[in-house]
Design a protein with these regions (language model features):
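Canonical Rossmann dinucleotide-binding motif of NAD(H)/NADP(H)-dependent dehydrogenases/reductases
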Residues: 1-26
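Conserved NAD(P)H cofactor-binding loop of Rossmann-fold oxidoreductase domains
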Residues: 67-72, 212
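Substrate-binding pocket helix/loop in short-chain dehydrogenase/reductase
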Residues: 74-87, 172
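Active-site helix of classical SDR
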Residues: 98, 132, 140
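Alpha-helical segment proximal to the catalytic Tyr-Lys
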Residues: 103, 144-149, 200
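C-terminal helical subdomain
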Residues: 155, 171-202, 209-211
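Short C-terminal tail/terminal secondary-structure segment
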Residues: 203-229
Length: 229
């Protein structure tokens, strides 16, 4: 039995589809309307109702995938309330769902948190999203220690992932060390691996899947690039 937050679209939908193809039952919570539990992940009573629904229907949780993304706004425009909302969706909800499901995790259970390569690097005006992704990356190893012996907890940091089924070419692709932009299946495949027995010796770890983008150092003058301060 698999729970996927933000599973109605993008990476989350691909993760849910891959689990279903493997024969698993999947419960999704998403703010987008559809044939799943619809609700706001920043709302405590909503999280509690969702958890009660899952446990009432299945009695256990094998895998929890905290995938839902928070809003991206920067210091110039992001309000206090928006920043708080980003952290509620991106950090508090994963923590609270893990807490709610803790008594109901099955033997061999796993939690996979979807962070971002922005947990280690930034663009201007992305503070709300970057802070949330950095928070869930740190939450991962904290939960792994607290749940040791019961649940394995890991996180994945995707880089540039094309969630619109478009084929980017030219500089968008060649700037990646692997020569292409990522796709949702690149992330879903790792999620399923981390939930499998093959990953039984992995916990508290973060895996960056970004085509090598964060490993490439670029200086002024490299590849025709120049800095404009």
């Amino acid at each position: 039995m698999v729970v996927v937050t933000g599973g109605a679209q993008g990476i989350g939908r691909c993760i849910a589809d891959e689990f279903r193809r493997s024969g698993a039952s999947v419960c999704i919570i998403d703010c987008q309307e559809g044939d799943h539990f619809v609700g706001d992940l920043s709302d405590k009573p909503t999280l509690e109702r969702f958890a009660q629904s899952v446990v009432g229907q299945y009695g256990r949780v094998d895998y929890l995938i905290n995938n839902a993304a928070s809003l991206m706004k920067g210091i110039d425009e992001c309000t206090f309330e928006e920043f708080q909302y980003a952290l509620s969706v991106g950090v508090t909800a994963p923590f609270y769902l893990t807490k709610l499901f803790a008594p109901h995790f099955a033997e061999g259970a796993a939690v996979v948190n979807i962070s971002s390569s922005r947990d280690r690097m930034s663009q201007p005006q992305t503070e709300s999203y970057t802070a949330a992704k950095g928070g869930i990356a740190a939450l991962t190893h904290a939960l792994a220690v607290s749940l040791a012996g019961r649940v394995r907890v890991n996180s994945i940091s995707p880089g540039w992932i094309d969630t619109k089924a478009m084929n980017y070419t030219g500089p968008d692709a060649t700037q990646q060390l692997v020569g292409r932009v990522g796709n949702p299946a690149d992330i879903a495949n790792m999620v399923l691996f981390l939930c499998s027995d093959k990953a039984g010796f992995i916990s508290g770890e973060n895996i960056c899947i970004d085509g090598g983008m964060t490993r490439q150092m670029i200086y002024h003058g490299d590849f025709g690039w120049s800095f404009r301060g």
